């Protein structure tokens, strides 16, 4: 019998060709950036300590001064002293230190109490390891860490949490070990994801912003306590930070001129001179052409990383919109080509990929495997006046993702009901390529929801995707506190074991709801679960309220603030809890939705309705982790499951969502924010699963939870459209205290083969859009390719896969997360 060859995605075929020694078909047209990429291919990132050192030196000298002014002075010290370098072949300037290749920087003000642990463990830890030289390690231990002992945000938060909240947050008195039940994320990022108003930099430059703030300074009332005590330090800080980034750029210009003087190659010499000219003009002044616009944005993006650890780095916003006027003008003038446009952009992509968003705490590393960072570029969508926004640049971004094999930056495509067929076709073709780009965000859900929460239509229509799959409205969003990740699968376990969890022995973590073996009805078990569920919600919101109050005393953001119209208008730092006219859109994560739905459905259906097993039999099987009880495990897997358009399971999911959203609506309002229910795990469904023992859906102990709002692994039997319908069925559309929902779908390349496959995928996307679901992302890959990469990681070094709102190199992931990806259902029919 003739064996049929396996259909491969273009990404898989490209890897196989490279393994076979064939020349990459795109190398010649992307020669420069391929050379840049090869310099750090497979390289473990290095820790660069310069930012932490110069930041710490300044902060030690300014103790007692207003925090926002101290922050600006520290940034000026960094700008003056940090190494500036010009990389061979690069066309852009702007690095956050002196390391060539992949590197990350430290933020001791955030989690400096972890520094000693980090220096010891980072090089060898399984999640996102990083190297550090002995000399730099000594600087960290002797010159940086001592100042921050007792001064870090993490230490302050650890002390501020009430005992009952602390117990569900941390597993040790010092807060160095996470419990993975109600996890705070604010101690490994000084704010959640963010998007700057890059357009104001391109149009006015930092000198223009500085002039605005100087005028505000001159207008202050000398007799006003508010003006002199609150506003003056803020204004002085914003002026200083404008000077700092301009100085930093000028130092890069000097370095480029020096490199040009020493360069014998006339072509490279001319490039270096032009790079110097760019850096002398931007970001101080408005950009005059496309190249300057790219350089100005890149300086702004990179200097933001020196300011503080913002979420998963600062997102890039709607690049195809704010770059388009420069692109159009230069194309019409005949001074720019599409090839050169891609070269400039891809030089930026490489620079962003080289910078690693370093998480030094063990919990931070577990949450963000594969060196996760999201500088999401948003394309498509609508203009502020409601017209389709796609343009020629939109298609160039998609082309770049198909041709240039790099996992950064992330690419997010906005979709709306009137999206052009050409755009949807190009999006589908890019998804089919197989590297996980782009993720999709739905205008039909996001825009009406944000208008209902207080945004104008113009503001909501202009949203940008930020972070994993959140959205931001530049100049209107003002909320920055890191959210909580709440493990609702632990509520199932605590309902089964009278408020205890196997992982934590006899510690009474939850409410004593009784011996579940003695429950005689579904109502009894449901009542026990609801009590544990509500305990987790209460803990989440108390924790987050303390986070909000504590952060304002430890963080300031003068650069982020000067780029925000409301901060400039009201002379208030972005980290303050309330900014006049701002909209505070925060969130907490509902972790393990599919696991919880399926577990509750199994108990309700099999134990109390069909009586196919008793609570004693169920708990005996769970306590044995199904060893010797494989028949019960298989029976549990026959129960109704989320992800199959099954009304029985979906009704339970809708009630779980209703409880979470109702709580958020009531107590978020009391806190003065929108602290809404969100279903986006990053990679945390893996470590959260490691604390949850066997669950009634047949999942074995310590196995990953269901991720985001996706089904449990192997539980989706009715095809991908049923996943969409279950997601729709479990949402409470009439309630507005809801936020993002992440959906992962895995197709085999055979499923989307050829033009017919592209058309099927386009129609699938239209169905998703019509259902008003927030997000969806795809892996188009064969499971065999992933298994081969596990066995021979060096050969598959460049295999890119979709994780949770971002793509990463498969071989950079831990075996647990690799296995999690392999276990996702690969649909071969649509």
Curated annotation (Swiss-Prot):
GO cellular component, one term: cytosol
Lineage of the species this protein comes from: Bacteria, Pseudomonadati, Thermodesulfobacteriota, Desulfovibrionia, Desulfovibrionales
Biological process annotations from GO: alkanesulfonate catabolic process
GO molecular function, one term: lyase activity
Recorded catalytic activity of this chain's protein: 2-hydroxyethane-1-sulfonate = acetaldehyde + sulfite + H(+)
Post-translational modification comment from the UniProt entry: Requires the activating protein IslB to generate the key active site glycyl radical on Gly-805 that is involved in catalysis.
Family assignment from sequence similarity: Belongs to the glycyl radical enzyme (GRE) family.
Protein name: Isethionate sulfite-lyase
Domain (PFL): residue spans on this chain: 31-700
Residues carrying Glycine radical: 805
Remaining remarks: Taurine is an abundant dietary and host-derived molecule whose metabolism to hydrogen sulfide (H2S) by members of the human gut microbiota has many prominent connections to host health and disease. The human gut bacterium and opportunistic pathogen Bilophila wadsworthia produces H2S when respiring sulfite (HSO3-) released from organosulfonate substrates such as taurine and isethionate.
Residues that hold 2-hydroxyethane-1-sulfonate according to the record: 189, 193, 468-470, 678
Pfam family, one: Gly_radical
Broad class of enzyme this protein falls into: lyase
Function summary: Involved in an anaerobic respiration pathway that converts the sulfonate taurine (2-aminoethanesulfonate) to ammonia, acetate and sulfide. Catalyzes the radical-mediated C-S bond cleavage of isethionate (2-hydroxyethanesulfonate) to form sulfite and acetaldehyde. Is not able to use any alternate organosulfonate or (S)-1,2-propanediol or choline as a substrate, showing that this enzyme is highly specific for isethionate.
Subunit: Homodimer.
């Amino acid at each position: 019998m003739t064996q049929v060859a396996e259909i491969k995605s273009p990404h898989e075929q490209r890897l196989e060709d490279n393994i076979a020694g064939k020349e990459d078909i795109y190398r010649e047209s992307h020669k420069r950036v391929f050379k840049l990429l090869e310099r750090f291919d497979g390289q473990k990132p290095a820790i660069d300590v310069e930012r932490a050192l110069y930041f710490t030196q300044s902060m030690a000298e300014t103790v007692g001064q207003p925090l926002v002014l101290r922050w600006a002075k520290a940034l000026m010290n960094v700008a003056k002293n940090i190494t500036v370098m010009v990389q061979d072949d690069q066309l852009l300037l702007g690095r956050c230190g002196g390391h060539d290749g992949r590197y990350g920087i430290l933020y001791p003000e955030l989690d400096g109490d972890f520094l000693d642990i980090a220096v010891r463990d980072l090089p060898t830890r399984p999640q996102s390891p990083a190297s550090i030289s002995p000399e730099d390690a000594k600087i960290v231990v002797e010159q940086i860490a001592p100042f921050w002992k007792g001064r870090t945000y993490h230490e302050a938060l650890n002390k501020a949490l009430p005992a009952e909240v602390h117990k569900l947050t941390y597993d040790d008195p010092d807060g160095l070990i996470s419990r993975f039940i109600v996890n705070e994320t604010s101690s490994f990022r000084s704010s959640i994801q963010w998007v700057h108003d890059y357009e104001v930099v391109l149009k006015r430059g930092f000198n223009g912003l500085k002039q605005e703030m100087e005028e505000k300074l001159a207008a202050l009332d000398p007799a006003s306590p508010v003006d002199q005590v609150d506003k003056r330090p803020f204004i002085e800080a914003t002026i200083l930070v404008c000077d700092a980034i301009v100085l930093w750029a000028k130092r890069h210009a000097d370095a480029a001129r020096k490199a040009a003087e020493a360069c014998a190659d006339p072509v490279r010499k001319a490039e270096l001179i032009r790079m110097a000219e760019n850096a002398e003009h931007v970001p101080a002044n408005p950009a005059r052409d496309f190249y300057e616009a790219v350089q100005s944005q890149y300086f702004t993006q990179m200097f933001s990383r020196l300011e503080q650890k913002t979420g998963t780095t600062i997102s890039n916003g709607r690049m195809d919109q704010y770059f388009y006027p420069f692109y159009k003008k230069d194309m019409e003038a005949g001074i720019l080509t599409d090839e050169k446009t891609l070269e400039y952009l891809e030089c930026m992509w490489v620079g962003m990929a080289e910078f690693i968003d370093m998480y030094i705490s063990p919990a931070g590393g577990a949450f963000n495997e594969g060196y996760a960072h999201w500088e999401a570029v948003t394309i498509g969508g609508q203009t502020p006046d409601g017209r389709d926004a796609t343009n020629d640049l939109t298609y160039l971004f998609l082309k770049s993702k198909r041709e240039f094999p790099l996992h950064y930056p992330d690419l997010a495509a906005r979709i709306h009901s009137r999206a052009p067929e050409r755009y949807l076709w190009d999006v589908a073709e890019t998804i089919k390529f197989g590297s996980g780009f782009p993720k999709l965000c739905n205008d039909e859900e996001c825009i009406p929801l944000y208008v209902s929460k207080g945004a104008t239509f113009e503001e909501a229509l202009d949203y940008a995707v930020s972070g994993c799959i959140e959205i931001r409205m530049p100049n209107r969003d003002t909320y920055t506190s890191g959210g909580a990740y709440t493990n609702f699968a632990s509520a199932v376990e605590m309902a089964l074991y009278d408020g205890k969890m196997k992982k934590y022995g006899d510690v009474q973590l939850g409410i004593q709801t009784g011996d579940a073996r003695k429950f005689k009805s579904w109502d009894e078990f449901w009542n026990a679960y609801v009590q544990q569920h509500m305990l987790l919600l209460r803990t989440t919101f108390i924790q987050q309220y303390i986070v909000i109050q504590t952060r304002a005393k430890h963080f300031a953001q003068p650069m982020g603030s000067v780029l925000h119209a409301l901060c400039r208008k009201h002379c208030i730092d972005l980290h303050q809890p309330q900014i006049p006219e701002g909209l505070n859109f925060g969130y907490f994560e509902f972790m393990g939705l599919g696991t919880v739905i399926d577990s509750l459905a199994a108990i309700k259906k099999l134990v109390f309705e069909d009586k196919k097993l008793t609570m004693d039999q169920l708990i005996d099987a769970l306590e044995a982790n199904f060893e010797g009880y494989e028949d019960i495990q298989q029976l549990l897997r026959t129960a109704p499951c989320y992800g199959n358009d099954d009304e029985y399971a979906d009704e339970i999911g809708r009630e779980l969502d209703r409880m979470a959203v109702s709580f958020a609506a009531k107590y978020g309002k009391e806190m003065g924010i929108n602290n809404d229910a969100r279903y986006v795990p990053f990679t945390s469904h893996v470590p959260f699963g490691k604390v949850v023992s066997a669950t009634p859906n047949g999942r074995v102990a310590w196995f990953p939870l269901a991720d985001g709002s996706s089904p449990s692994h192997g539980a989706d039997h009715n095809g991908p459209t049923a996943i969409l319908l279950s997601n729709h069925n479990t949402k409470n559309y009439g309630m507005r205290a809801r936020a993002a929902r992440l959906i992962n779908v895995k197709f085999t390349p055979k499923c989307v083969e050829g033009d017919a496959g592209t058309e099927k995928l386009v129609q699938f996307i239209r169905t998703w859009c019509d259902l008003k679901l927030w997000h969806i992302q795809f892996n188009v890959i064969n499971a065999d390719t992933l298994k081969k990469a596990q066995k021979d990681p060096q050969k598959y070094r460049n295999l890119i896969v979709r994780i949770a709102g971002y793509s990463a190199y498969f071989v950079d992931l831990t075996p647990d997360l690799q296995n999690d990806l392999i276990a996702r259902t690969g649909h071969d029919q649509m």
